[in-house]
Amino acid sequence: LALTQMGHNDIADSSRPVFDGATGQHEAVAEHGGLSALGKNAVRSINALGGIIDISQLSKAAALQVLALSDAPVIASHSNVWQLSNVSRNLSDEEIDRIGESGGVIHVAPFRGYLFDSSDETLDQAIRAARQVAGITEDFYYPFELYWEIEDEAVQQKFLRTVSDLLGPGSIGDVIDHIDYIVSRIGVDHVGIGTDFNHGSGITGFNDASEALNVTIGLLARGYSAEDIHKIWGGNFLRVFRAVAVSKDKAIKE
């Protein structure tokens, strides 16, 4: 269960504050300072019911509070490494470390919009210019943000093509770089792959599920063993699934 997506809600703060058309700006960076009182109760309730908590897209404060409160391992279903790509929804080293300590799993997302270098000022200005031409706010938390607000379909499609061209194609190597980083910090038992294909990945060689074998080939080339790859392609998630069930049963007995 994810606690938020784009925009804050009554449960938690998001890493992607939503744009408010009425005010002409994004909402405040934080509404609750992480989790609300309702959100903290939600964590306890999800634990008690045997649900898996997904911290992807939570603010850093909210994610760390979930990790401190949860009695069971948690996952990030589709999140990358902030140190390699400083996009607001990607995970800091502190979040990565706490997920490892919880016994959880971080699923790296093969999506170009989460794998680019947002510290590149030239790229940033080019994306802002494209957004201005398309008639949406220049400020953004990820490059394609608010494309759905562009009413003219031709303008919308041109904007999507322009941003895709500016970002350029990502590679399977880019994806595995993030896997490597997580493995180096918390071990191969705590990493997986979480696709986000609803917009296409923008990753050459892994644009949809039919090309998943290319990732396996890339992992082998990086020196990962068959056992490691089994863990990355779902074994780690299944371990968490079982651990959460055990945690629920233990709570019931207590």
List the model feature ranges, each with a label.
Residues 108-110, 185-209:
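Short acidic/histidine-rich active-site segments
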Residues 1-6, 101-110, 191-195:
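Non-cysteine beta-strand/loop elements that form the S-adenosyl-L-methionine
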Residues 207-254:
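Mid-to-C-terminal alpha-helical segments outside catalytic/metal-binding sites
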Residues 53, 78, 106, 196, ...:
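Conserved, mostly hydrophobic/aromatic
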Residues 17-54, 58-75, 88-104, 173-189:
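Histidine/acidic residue-rich metal-binding segments in metalloenzymes
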Residues 92-157:
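Aromatic-lined glycan-binding groove of carbohydrate-active enzymes
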Residues 4-8, 51, 56-61, 79-82, ...:
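Active-site beta-loop-alpha junctions enriched in small/polar residues
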Residues 154-180, 226-241:
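C-terminal helical cap
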